[in-house]
Design a protein with these regions (language model features):
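Outer-membrane beta-barrel "beta-signal"
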Residues: 32-36, 88, 214-226
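Surface-exposed extracellular loop regions of Gram-negative outer-membrane beta-barrel proteins
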Residues: 1-32, 47-50, 54-77, 153-163, ...
Length: 226
């Protein structure tokens, strides 16, 4: 358990169009319980780790960026209850003497509801841009020649305004990324080259309403390590 207190930042108060000089400090009572299990040297796994956390937050005057018709604005939600569960899994599997598979994944369930005004139409509705379900997964095959990676990020439906009605709904999405990488020795330093295909399936989605994210794209990066 912990009790927290957060003052509005300078940008929260004064940023052009977004800021709100009337913001009140945010206060919260936070409760959390979690377990972690890990093991090395198993017959299948070199290493495996599992975590599970549950939490409940009772928040007064929660500071949020609130979407309006033409611009975003910082505002206080008078009373918010947030409950959630976070789960993660990480594992390393040796495939051969020189090749291994590294896997990881995470899932979040979060219910964050507005309890400010019991007479309001959005009473007990999920906060804007807060998905109930979200998760990620990744896998990398490491070899002496090249590393092959895959990752996916998924987000469930959200609402871009306070009322949880179909007109305000933003569809969920699942984005995939593939990568190839290899590290070279160059004298006293090392060069890591990586090629990626981002949004492999060319998924059309919005993170923010009316601002579509890019489709399929390619990226090549190089990193020197001295």
């Amino acid at each position: 358990y912990k009790s927290t207190f957060r003052l509005p930042t300078f940008n929260d108060l004064y940023y052009y169009r977004l800021g709100n000089r009337n913001l009140r400090p945010e206060k919260a009572d936070e409760y959390n319980v979690g377990i972690t299990w890990s093991k090395s040297g198993l017959s299948v796994f070199d290493y495996i780790s599992v975590t599970l956390d549950g939490y409940y937050n009772d928040v007064t005057d929660k500071i949020v960026a609130f979407p309006t018709t033409y611009a975003w604005k910082m505002a206080n939600y008078g009373k918010v209850h947030a409950a959630g569960v976070d789960a993660t899994l990480a594992a390393t599997v040796p495939l051969t003497e020189k090749i291994r598979l590294i896997m990881s994944g995470g899932y979040t369930w979060q219910k964050a509801i507005d309890l400010t005004d019991s007479d309001a139409k959005n009473y007990k509705d999920q906060l804007p841009y807060t998905p109930l379900h979200s998760g990620n997964a990744s896998a990398i095959v490491e070899t002496p020649w090249v590393n092959v990676g895959y990752s996916a990020v998924g987000v469930g439906k959200r609402y871009y305004l306070s009322q949880n009605i179909p007109e305000n709904e933003i569809e969920g999405y699942l984005e995939h990324t593939m990568s190839l990488s290899h590290e070279f020795a160059l004298g006293g330093c090392r060069l890591l080259l990586q090629a990626e295909i981002i949004n492999l399936t060319d998924e059309q989605y919005d993170v923010i309403k009316y601002y579509p994210m890019p489709g399929r794209s390619w990226r090549l990066t190089g990193t020197f390590k001295f």
